[in-house]
């Protein structure tokens, strides 16, 4: 199994240190797995060193497709690295109650995956560190990326610039263990979780809107036109589909009152 940690810090500080601890835990679990030694490859992508230019906000990737982005850098190569991985760890320190600018730019450059989820085979773990406050807010912000991925584990660690007492070091170790075990367990399962109602609602909403706005958002229309029930082949509870479509019909009534889409 392959794990890619995407580091959004401009330096190798607390966020990197905690990620290294997770790496060590995962490799230990793989080495001593009950089924025998598991081959686990752990790699890093440091956004500070990546050739990922600042998003221009041109909106080209959303309606027309990511291949229409005017920036010629390593975005497509990064996408390939993510798709080739079984697990992704997004890592960011808390800056001004949110993710770092490096991570925010990464999120902006891959915003098209929220319209067209492609990371359906990837398990996702989030790691955030902060001196004291902003952990909850940053985790929430970081969760709105990597469209299609299965968010299975979150780790938030307070890392103030003081020497830690032994008991606090132990509490960090316990949190790292718990989050790492949860992530490792999910990596061993190649079966995606059954779609929740919110997942189905998300799919049906984008499919319905893509059909109504196909001239404005051709990339979305092409992505959804051959998909009937979900982003990938899986069993979907018909009651969830019925309820989602009913809610979307109600939503579209208001949509049509406010916007011209033809």
Per-segment meaning from a language model:
Residues 1-91, 97-105, 111-112, 152, ...:
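N-terminal beta1-alpha1-beta2 submodule of the flavodoxin-like/Rossmannoid cofactor-binding fold
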Residues 137-140, 144, 148, 182, ...:
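Compact, basic/aliphatic-enriched, mixed alpha/beta core segments that act as assembly/interaction modules
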Residues 149, 153-185:
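Conserved anion/nucleotide-ligand pocket segment
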Residues 101, 135-140, 167-168:
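A short secondary-structure junction signal
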Residues 9-13, 96, 129-133, 160-163:
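Short histidine/acidic/glycine/proline-rich micro-motifs that form metal-
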Residues 119-158:
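Short, glycine-/small-residue-rich phosphate/pyrophosphate-handling segment
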Residues 103-107, 140-143:
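"Short basic amphipathic alpha-helical interaction patches in structured regions
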Residues 45, 105-123, 129-130:
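P-loop/Walker A phosphate-binding loop and immediately adjacent motor/lid segment at beta-alpha junctions
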